[in-house]
Amino acid sequence: MSGAVHDEQWEVFVHDWLIVCKSDDYPWSERLGGAGDKGRDVVGYKSDPNVEGYSWDNYQCKLYKKSLGFSDVVVEFGKLIYFTLNGDYPIPQKYFFVAPYDLSTT
C-alpha cells in the first residue's frame, strides 16, 4: 500500500494541525500516542500542564478504514474514566475523536 498513512503519521498530522491552526486555544500541546498514552493521542493544553488543575482537551486519533463504532468509543471512554479516577490526569474539558470516516450508529 504505497502512500498509505499509518497511525503514527495520523497522530503527527493532527498534532501539527493543532500547532498551526489552534495555537491561540492551546499554548501547549503534546503528542502522546502509542503504548502507554493512557488514552491520549494528542493533547491541547489550555493552561500550564505542570500546574495542578490544568485545563486540557483530548484528541483521540483513529485511522480506521471504516466508521468508528460504539465498541471503539466505549473502549476509549473506559480508558478516560479509569485514568481520571486513578488520578493520572484531570478530566478533559473536551474530548474529540479525529477519524476520516465519521461515527457509525452501531
Where are the model-predicted features located?
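Mixed-charge (Asp/Glu-Lys/Arg
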Residues: 1-38, 43-106
